[in-house]
Each structure stands twice: as C-alpha cells, then as structure tokens.
Amino acid sequence: MAIISSLANHLLIAMPSLKDPNFERSVVYLCEHNEQGSVGLIINRPLQFPLSIVFEQLQIEPIRVEKNGLPLLFGGPVQPERGFVIHKQMGGWRSSLFLQDEVTVTTSNDIIRAIAYDEGPKDVLITLGYAAWTEQQLEREIMSNTWLVCPYKSEILYEVPFEERWEYAGLTLGIKMNQLSSDAGHA
C-alpha cells in the first residue's frame, strides 16, 4: 500500500456525522496540504446568486447572456468575499496557481472578464471563500472519521451535477454515502 505524503489534489468527502453547516455533505478539492496546514475549496455548494452579480460589481457586460446564469459556489467560510476560479487550461491570467494537469486556480479579475467575453476557459467553477485547516487539524479530523479522502476525479470537479457530487465521490470509493450511519464509532 502506498503512503500518501500530501493530500493536495485529492478530494475530501464529508461524512454524514459532520453537521457543521459550512461543511455538511460537502466535497472539498484540496489545493494545498503540508506541515503548516491545508487549504481547499468546496465544489458542491451553489450559492443563491449567479455570476451576474459579480459582473455587475465589476461593471462588465457579458457577450453571451447564459454566462450570467453560471452559478457561484460557496468555497468555504474563510474570506467569503474572495473569489477563486478553478479551471482546466492555463492561460495568461495575472494570478494563477497551476495545481495539476486539469486544475488551475486563478484569483485575478482578468479571468472573470475573459469568461464574460467568451474568451475564458471552457470548464470553470467559481467559488467565493475557501476552507482552511491549521497544522495537523485535517489529519485529526480524518482520523476521527469526519472526512473520507478520495483521489482526484476530473468528472467530479467539472461534469457531475453539484447536488450529486457528494454521493458520486463516495461511489468512486465503493461507498454509498446515504447508507452510512451518522453516528461515529470505532470497532
């Protein structure tokens, strides 16, 4: 069995026992995991307002009306005013972090303008806020059965409907999430 030294570029799946409203039934893409802590983005929690709100705030008039309807996602409780665009292709954006072949995270407004003008990446998720864990906090939560760890799957990030991602991520591990007990315990 291989030992994983970093959980970066993995997915966290909230166990049914996790009742924190910020993380209940969430799937988190881990952008960073090291000895200082972890940072991730929740990828299955659409907010009640669309991207058109961001376009209005930035005074952008999108070329294609359907861009207005792109959902914004709740990325986590830390800095909820801060936006993150998860996308496949690189590009010349001002502030991008390449994480792996299919995942780049950009935080600069130029990518939002490109999306509005139909010049941005095809596959995108736009989140507000992020999740963070202090040193060893995530490891303790995993050991206490708060999270399952799933290898990255492109379809979970870009194709599976938001409301199905939690169950789908579990199925990639052979687990039916709705059949797990919300009671924590150890055998």
From Swiss-Prot:
Transmembrane segments: none annotated. HAMAP family: UPF0301. Pfam families: DUF179 (PF02622). InterPro entries: AlgH-like (IPR003774). Belongs to the UPF0301 (AlgH) family. The lineage of its organism: Bacteria, Pseudomonadati, Pseudomonadota, Gammaproteobacteria, Legionellales. This is UPF0301 protein lpg0586. PANTHER family: UNCHARACTERIZED PROTEIN YQGE (PTHR30327), UPF0301 PROTEIN YQGE (PTHR30327:SF1). GO terms for cellular component: cytosol.
